[in-house]
Amino acid sequence: MIHNPILPGFNPDPCICRKGDDYYVAVSTFEWFPGIPIYHSKDLKHWELFTHVLTDDEKVNLKNLPSAKAIWAPCLTYNEQEDRFYVVYGVMNSMNARYFDVDNYLISAPSITGPWSEPVYLHSAGFDASILHDDDGRKYIVSLEWETRSGYEQPGVICLCEYDPAAQKIIGYPKRIWRGGTDRGCIEAPHLTKRGGYYYLMCAEGGTGYNHCVTMGRAKNVWGPYEGDPQNPIVTSAPGVSYERDDPDHLKPKYFNPDSLLQKSGHGSYVDLPTGETYLVHLCARPFIPELRCTLGRETSIQKMQWTDDGWLRMADGGRLAQVDVPESKLPDCPLPLLPEHDDFDAPTLLPYYLSLIHI
């Protein structure tokens, strides 16, 4: 069995991709540097910190940014046609006065270890941007359009625009394509993939708190219209029905589920294996009770999934509740050596596990 969380501690907003027999997960780092750690595995059970994407503070300026801002929700993809990795990420500058001031960027590299290109500015239309590499070579950026007007559903709606890699800029203005697959509100974290003739739009809903979940929509055309999965949400810690579209609060502790060891499960990303299996990574948390304080932060877990005959993604156990222990894949077992118990600060280089604040 695979025991969750696979990435314990501060590892939120996971995005998974595969190149050959190698699997990689990127997570958020906010104001901590170096930015965007990449974890590696060959069996989805044993994971190691492999590299960081943002290691040059000249390419990303995090100085003077407050806590919980800066690098949000990286989207890591591998384009097989180009044999190239892409990362789309946002730099959150401010969340004051209902307005989220965010700049979204794209970088790419021939290897997961780099060298990474200069950041290309995409837009500031919303956060949690990600990229789709379509079969015909075209590329699309999907993101959340932030709603600032009082009385409107918060935080907004999922939008799509095309990206021109030659000109290194988006084409036109983002078009609204999806308002969610449930009534939990607080839609975010869109990931767009293509499979079996459908464009699949995976999102998080309910806020990144106790009503968090993973939802799915699909369409035959990338611009829509998108239909929601009739079983939405497909993964969550709070499987009940709720209407929260008019509530911008993200925490929602009233939805704490005492029957779930993993709380706040949402913000997912899936990967298909050459064995015919599918797995989904998602963020989660393990709070102290009754205080509901998550001192380890938001962590990364994994769930075994399966595709139905009519093309929807389901948890392999037939439920929706995120599980602590999930079946292993058919991939060969690849255990890793134990982490070193000490580090030599007199050595030329240190182990890669250290982060530092760079906002001052």
Predicted regions and their residues:
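Carbohydrate-active catalytic/glycan-binding domains of CAZyme proteins
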Residues: 1-358
